[in-house]
């Protein structure tokens, strides 16, 4: 979604929200939460508050009028009814006409509500320096994580990683072979964005940064001499992330054409830009997702930018055997999330030994 459209959608949602949700939104902008995250949270709040009104839990006609006392006095049973409502609404699930939303979606909804409740019960201050209320019913609600072993996750994911020579092979394919699959009509669009697309993909493959971090990189954030890219991690923390040397060439090639091809000016600080009606603007995450899907499907298998991040992490662990190093590279606070990569590599090592 384009940034302008995203802002418009956020404003529409803000217009129907209770005042304390607007305070929450303003507070999280200062953290800063990304606009994408806040947009997703506002959508969850609209769904939840609409249910409060429609179910009669809140005795009001519109969600703007849902008072703080409704949230303060909400019972665990009320929340459980809301969760059952989500499970039993087929039309909320885009993947099925028979079942309600997935557990992942429910967890995301509860996470958004937990964030709002934490703000209202711990972070915000009224005129007396106290939170709006103290009772946090969200602490009584348990979330169910998707049940899957590391072995299962590793098996599902490793076929979608470009390991070993495939990392460079993927970039070479886009650079030299992909154009051969295109019609004459599609050639001009491909060549217009070829250097930019290669630079984006190379950055994620070489650094393992998140999609949101990649699209928000500014020109000043990338240092080709030290091979460091500065990004804003989750929670608003700035981080200096090293990238592998193979990406440097792709950045240089893109920078050679960026100004002329995308008609950028000194005001265009974004590193990755797109051109629409002769105006340059920061590329949006959905555009990157589409281009990664397009190129990867033609090369081997359709993947997401997050799988490119997994690729870097797995390759880095294979070289270092250090979960701490991989965690630092990815911007994780603990090494627990890197267990997946160790499992993938252990399986690869076992397969190699079996072939001896």
Curated annotation (Swiss-Prot):
Pfam family, one: Phage_integrase
Gene3D superfamilies given in the database record: 1.10.150.130, Intergrase catalytic core
Active-site residues per Swiss-Prot or TrEMBL entry: 210, 234, 306, 309, 332, 341
Domain of life: Bacteria
Places the protein is found: Cytoplasm
Protein name: Tyrosine recombinase XerS
GO cellular component, one term: cytoplasm
Function, in words: Site-specific tyrosine recombinase, which acts by catalyzing the cutting and rejoining of the recombining DNA molecules. Essential to convert dimers of the bacterial chromosome into monomers to permit their segregation at cell division.
Keyword terms: Cell cycle, Cell division, Chromosome partition, Cytoplasm, DNA integration, DNA recombination, DNA-binding
């Amino acid at each position: 979604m384009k940034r302008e459209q995203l802002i418009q959608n956020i404003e529409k949602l803000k217009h129907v929200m209770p005042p304390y949700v607007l305070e929450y939104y303003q507070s999280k902008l200062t953290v800063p939460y990304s606009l994408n995250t806040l947009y997703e949270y506002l959508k969850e709040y609209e769904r939840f508050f609409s249910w409060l009104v429609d179910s009669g839990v809140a005795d009001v006609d519109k969600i703007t009028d849902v008072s703080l006392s409704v949230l303060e006095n909400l019972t665990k049973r009320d929340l459980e009814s809301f969760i059952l409502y989500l499970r039993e609404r087929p039309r909320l699930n885009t993947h099925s006409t028979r079942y309600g939303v997935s557990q992942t979606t429910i967890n995301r909804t509860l996470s958004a509500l937990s964030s709002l409740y934490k703000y209202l019960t711990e972070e915000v201050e009224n005129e007396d320096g106290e939170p709006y209320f103290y009772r946090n019913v969200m602490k009584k609600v348990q979330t169910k994580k998707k049940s899957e072993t590391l072995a299962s996750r590793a098996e599902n994911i490793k076929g979608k990683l470009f390991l070993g020579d495939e990392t460079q092979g993927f970039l070479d394919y886009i650079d030299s072979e992909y154009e051969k699959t295109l019609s004459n009509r599609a050639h001009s669009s491909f060549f217009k964005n070829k250097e930019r697309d290669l630079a984006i993909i190379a950055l994620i493959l070489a650094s393992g940064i998140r999609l949101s971090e990649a699209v928000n990189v500014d020109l000043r954030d990338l240092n080709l001499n030290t091979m460091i890219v500065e990004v804003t991690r989750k929670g608003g923390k700035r981080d200096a992330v090293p990238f592998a040397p193979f990406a440097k060439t792709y950045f240089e090639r893109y920078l050679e054409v960026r100004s002329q091809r995308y008609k950028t000016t000194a005001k265009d600080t974004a590193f990755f830009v797109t051109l629409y009606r002769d105006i340059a603007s920061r590329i949006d995450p959905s555009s990157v997702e589409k281009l990664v899907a397009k190129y990867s499907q033609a090369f081997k298998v359709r993947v997401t930018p997050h799988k490119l991040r997994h690729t870097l992490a797995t390759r880095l662990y294979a070289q270092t055997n250090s979960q701490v190093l991989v965690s630092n590279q990815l911007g994780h606070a603990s090494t627990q999330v890197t267990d997946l990569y160790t499992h993938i590599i252990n399986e690869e090592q076992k397969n190699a030994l079996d072939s001896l």
